[in-house]
């Protein structure tokens, strides 16, 4: 599938809950093929920003354009089609359907698009790539946490999306499975040029990405300012 070469553009994005402004005028650009991490302490607004950029939560104000399209000006049918064809999502919890097998879960996006047969072999290929060939027909409750998360990643990739949005994808995993997931995402970006935006509190994970965006109290800050703030917090302790 051919996509417009334009990436993600965020302008003066704000999010308010009650009287509290959580995201404070964020402006940023993410180029096609980039691999970007959103870092910052808990409560800094990382996940909120990711959800807005990925069309899952509307901003209070500001604009988000993906491939030159203002995603919050689309109607429900348009945004559903846009997500299904161009976006893949990975979360801390896998949200797989326990009554279905690994391969059936991977194929859910294709089933929704009416393209089950067209993507069957590719779904099998992904599970083989993720060392799950002998687990394809296992139900989710027979898989380990790391195996289930790999199934979730395969599900996110099965429609060949241009963009992957991942919210703490290793947050519930042990160190061994964390490295597996990190390596998978790095390989996907390198080999397919899929644009990846990932939220992580893990500095080792962030260091594997091509670029880090640092959030402090809902604002994007420079690396120098980010390090200075971290240092001042440690000193205060």
UniProtKB/Swiss-Prot annotation:
ATP binds at residues 40-47. Disulfide bonds: none annotated. Its EC number is 7.6.2.-. GO terms for molecular function: ATP binding; ATP hydrolysis activity; transmembrane transporter activity. It is an enzyme of class 7 (translocase). It is found in: Cell inner membrane. It is a peripheral membrane protein. One of its GO terms (cellular component) is plasma membrane. One of its GO terms (biological process) is transmembrane transport. Keywords: ATP-binding, Cell inner membrane, Cell membrane, Membrane, Nucleotide-binding, Translocase, Transport. Belongs to the ABC transporter superfamily. Lipoprotein translocase (TC 3.A.1.125) family. The complex is composed of two ATP-binding proteins (LolD) and two transmembrane proteins (LolC and LolE). Part of the ABC transporter complex LolCDE involved in the translocation of mature outer membrane-directed lipoproteins, from the inner membrane to the periplasmic chaperone, LolA. Responsible for the formation of the LolA-lipoprotein complex in an ATP-dependent manner. This is Lipoprotein-releasing system ATP-binding protein LolD. It comes from Leptospira interrogans serogroup Icterohaemorrhagiae serovar Lai (strain 56601). The gene is lolD.
């Amino acid at each position: 599938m051919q996509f417009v070469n334009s990436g993600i553009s965020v302008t003066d994005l704000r999010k308010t809950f009650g009287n509290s402004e959580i995201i404070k005028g964020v402006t940023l650009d993410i180029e096609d093929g980039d691999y970007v991490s959103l870092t910052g302490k808990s409560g800094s607004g990382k996940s909120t920003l990711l959800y807005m950029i990925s069309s899952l939560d509307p901003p209070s104000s500001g604009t988000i354009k993906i491939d030159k399209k203002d995603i919050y000006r689309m109607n429900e049918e348009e945004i559903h089609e846009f997500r299904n064809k161009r976006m893949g999502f990975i979360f801390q919890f896998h949200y797989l359907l326990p009554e279905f097998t690994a391969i059936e879960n991977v194929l859910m996006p294709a089933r929704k698009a009416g393209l089950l047969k067209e993507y069957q072999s590719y779904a099998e290929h992904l599970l083989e790539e993720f060392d799950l060939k002998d687990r394809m027909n296992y139900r989710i409750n027979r898989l380990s946490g790391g195996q289930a998360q790999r199934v979730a990643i395969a599900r996110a990739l099965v429609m060949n999306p241009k963009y992957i949005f991942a919210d703490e994808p290793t947050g519930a995993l042990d160190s061994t499975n964390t490295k597996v997931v990190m390596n998978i995402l790095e390989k996907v970006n390198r080999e397919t040029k899929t644009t990846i935006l990932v939220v992580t509190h893990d500095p080792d994970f962030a260091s594997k990405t091509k670029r880090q965006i640092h959030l402090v109290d809902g604002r994007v800050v420079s690396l120098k300012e980010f390090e200075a703030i971290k240092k001042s917090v440690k000193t205060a302790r």
